[in-house]
Amino acid sequence: MSKHSLIENLKEQIEPIAEGLDYELYHIEFVKEGKENYLRIYIDSENGVSLEGCEKVSRAISELLDDIDPIQESYYLEVSSPGIDRVLYTDKHLEKYKSYNIVLNLYSPIDKKKKYEGELVDFNENEIDIKVEENIVTIPREKISKTTLKGEL
């Protein structure tokens, strides 16, 4: 099974578990770091994410993973909040954080810059508009390597 298929399969099964515990499944990733594999589950809620919440979701997901055994190699399960400087992966994430400050990292420079920071004004399937100082800058989505919420306390 490809990594993409694995993630999609896990998403279908983990999403109802997270929702049943009053959390939103924010993102799933399966990564190799050094010699170790990690299945990372990011959860969120309107009221934030507590350590106890992560533990509760982790136990429930762990039971599911033991039952369905979707990953043949050994791995560590990590459940956490996406954090204050969270990556915005989906249109749903972008919609939620319209009018917030974001950081766009680019694959290659546009106007000699590989990083843009500003207020998320709008987006569509092809581009993202951000307000940088008093100007609206339109960045093609294909040029964006990562979109991150600019955490401000």
From Swiss-Prot:
The keyword Cytoplasm applies. Keywords: Cytoplasm, Ribosome biogenesis. The keyword Cytoplasm applies. It comes from the Bacteria. Disulfide bonds: none annotated. It is found in: Cytoplasm. InterPro entries: Ribosome_maturation_RimP, RimP_C, RimP_C_sf, RimP_N, RimP_N_sf. GO terms for biological process: ribosomal small subunit assembly; translation. Pfam families: DUF150_C, RimP_N. GO terms for cellular component: cytosol. HAMAP family: RimP. Required for maturation of 30S ribosomal subunits. Belongs to the RimP family. This is Ribosome maturation factor RimP.
